[in-house]
């Protein structure tokens, strides 16, 4: 199986290796025109849960994982580049009317929309919100996007996801005085599952113009 932290394709270990399938998780991303018919498979993981899928031998490849990769020689990784995050709110949100950069104290008075860490065996991570801040926890970026558009809270989103909504005015980007606005993203894989299929997927991913656009070093 292959896991995307932000975008997913899958080739389950239980499937016929000669007939891998691909799932398009949303309209924001697709490596191929094929569709994965295994919607019951848990192919979407976030934060520590992404690396955990690799270290627990539940995935052969992960794409878009952030934070430090595992140090074991059983696994390899490649840096994809930086994932740019943008702090966004709906036009109806109170923070939309403030012209100056938003400081953490002010942001902390408003509900944060956050994605929960899918890790089961390791300590979960939290990013880009204050510990004392009220928050709504959602499953993935699609649900977070809907919550932000609905004005239920504020939060950071990858720029490549929200760019169309910023251009249309459905969401507004706000400057902040602090918070981690860029994440280093990785492609990781299990060395014990090395084979022709694994190498083919890695080459396909690393040579993808869309991947290079999403994760840049600018």
Residue ranges: model-predicted function:
Residues 1-13, 17-20, 201, 211-212:
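Alpha-helical linker/hinge and terminal dimerization helices associated
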Residues 9-71:
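Central regulatory/effector-binding core of bacterial HTH transcription factors
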Residues 10-12, 132-134, 183-185:
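Short amphipathic alpha-helical segments
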Residues 54-55, 147-152, 187:
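Hydrophobic residues within well-ordered alpha-helices
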Residues 74-152, 157, 161-180, 199, ...:
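C-terminal regulatory
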Residues 178-191:
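Periplasmic-binding protein-like
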């Amino acid at each position: 199986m292959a896991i995307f932290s932000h975008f997913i394709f899958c080739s389950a270990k239980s499937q016929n290796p000669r007939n891998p399938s691909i799932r398009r998780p949303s309209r924001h991303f697709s490596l191929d025109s094929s569709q994965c018919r295994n919607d019951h498979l848990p192919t979407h993981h976030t934060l520590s849960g992404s690396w955990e899928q690799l270290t627990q031998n539940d995935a052969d490849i992960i794409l878009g994982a952030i934070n430090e990769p595992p140090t074991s020689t059983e696994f390899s990784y490649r840096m994809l580049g930086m994932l740019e995050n943008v702090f966004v709110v709906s036009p109806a949100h109170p923070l939309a009317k403030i012209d100056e950069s938003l400081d953490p104290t002010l942001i902390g008075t408003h509900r944060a929309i956050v994605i929960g860490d899918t890790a089961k065996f390791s300590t979960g991570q939290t990013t880009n919100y204050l510990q004392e801040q009220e928050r709504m926890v959602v499953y993935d970026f699609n649900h977070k996007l809907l919550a932000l558009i609905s004005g239920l809270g504020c939060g950071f989103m990858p720029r490549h996801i929200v760019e169309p909504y910023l251009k249309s005015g459905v969401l507004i980007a706000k400057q902040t005085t602090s918070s981690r606005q860029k994440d280093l993203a990785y492609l990781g894989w299990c060395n014990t599952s090395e084979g022709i299929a694994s190498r083919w997927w890695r080459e396909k991913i690393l040579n993808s113009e869309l991947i290079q656009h999403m994760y840049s070093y600018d």
